[in-house]
Amino acid sequence: CSIAIDGSPEPANLECIIPRVALDGAPVEMRPMIYGHGLFGKADGVNGSVNPQLAQDHGMVNCATDEIGMSGYDIGSVAGALVDLSQFKLLPDRLAQGIINELFLARLMFHPGGLGTDAAFQNAGQPVMENENVYYMGASQGGIMGGALTAVSPDFIQSSLLVGAMNYSSLLPRSVDFDLYADVMYPAYPDEMSHPLLFGLMQILWDRSEPNGYAHRMTDNPPPNTPEH
């Protein structure tokens, strides 16, 4: 969990898919995998698209948590920050916490003392997940944020980044998904000549919690105490 504004613990949301193949017949250990949801999505995205069939066909237990900072619960605060960019620091700060939450979830998934000790993740008293490795797959926003997450993870050795990218200050003006948010931001900052400068200033803060700030760590230059990816 993270810390709320009043200093109290703030529980992190969690949803998982355990495929039937893990429960039918003799106990079989599945590969644990973290799923990163799309733009302003939520943890329940793990239940959508091809994820259930992927888990069944390839023997995986998929879990997800909200990528707070850019989850469905953050739309209001993001809109508020876009009309007053002095408040923008809230977004990258929460994104950093979202990365931490996913790191803890990954450790919980494959650690011998983690989720496998809970009856909900067992078959005939045995854990349904292996405890040797943990993996990541993200799509859209999850593919983008997965770059930073994998770069700092002490546990991931393989990640699948679908529609991966970096540098939100370059991505936003080129994305049709930003049109709705541009309708919020641009009336507050009507000078079009200032927009590139504003995006550049936003990026300075964003770098600490998106792939642009971790590109030099993603592949052959991992941080200390982390594996090669």
Give residue spans per PLM region.
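N-terminal cap/lid segment of alpha/beta-hydrolase-fold proteins
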Residues: 1-29
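Phosphate/oxyanion-binding active-site loops and adjacent basic polyanion-contact surfaces
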Residues: 3-14, 94-103, 207
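Cap/lid segment of the alpha/beta-hydrolase catalytic domain
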Residues: 25-123
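Primarily recognizes the serine-hydrolase "nucleophile elbow" in alpha/beta-hydrolase
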Residues: 115, 120-173
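The feature captures the conserved acid-bearing segment of alpha/beta-hydrolase catalytic domains
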Residues: 164-229
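Alpha-helix capping and helix-loop boundary segments enriched in small/acidic/polar residues
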Residues: 27, 41, 86-97, 136-137, ...
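Loop/turn elements at helix/coil->beta-strand transitions in domains of secreted/extracellular proteins
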Residues: 28-32, 58-61, 131-133, 154-158, ...
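Generic beta-strand/beta-sheet core signal
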Residues: 17-19, 35-37, 63-66, 137-139, ...
